[in-house]
Amino acid sequence: MRLTQLRRATLSVICLLTTTALFAEPVTYEIDPRHTFPSFEAEHQGGLSVWRGKIRSTSGTIVIDREAQTGNVDVTMDMSTIDFGMDAMTDHAKAEDILDVAQFPTATYTGEMSQFTAQGGPTAIEGQLTLHGVTNPLNLRVNSFQCNPPAMGRSVCGADASGSFNRDDYGVDFGMGRFLMYVNLEIQVEGVLVED
């Protein structure tokens, strides 16, 4: 029994030391597109319901130094893969009078982590969203952030971030006067550690 407890304690110390070493300098995570799905939320029929368009193809990187409490994100979203779950609505969202994905196939978000918890997890990002060929400031709240211990295998960090913007600021003014202009951006993301 004591031997088992000693082994568990030793493993815990090893995990702690390994994790501390891992986050003692900036580390880079590559966004895992299989577990990363940003979405745009917009009201439908004058507020009757909320529709969510999920982006099915995303790439980018996350760099973080939890000890120094610094970091940055760089996310590219393939707007041609947006999916509202209804073919007619998805096709219209991609059309020239809304997102015009033929001319503006990607949207990007880049930013610097600006606030952290005492444990080194980011809670806010100050950045810029480029959508429909227009770039504007957009700050995100990091609602959750967690990394698994390296002893579990590959090192993976995940986060959920959110923010809102006026789509008219990006030239997406379809339905102005009939629909609300404010849109929520939700980003669920997982990144895999880039090994040296």
Residue ranges: model-predicted function:
Residues 3, 23-24:
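Hydrophobic membrane-targeting and insertion signals
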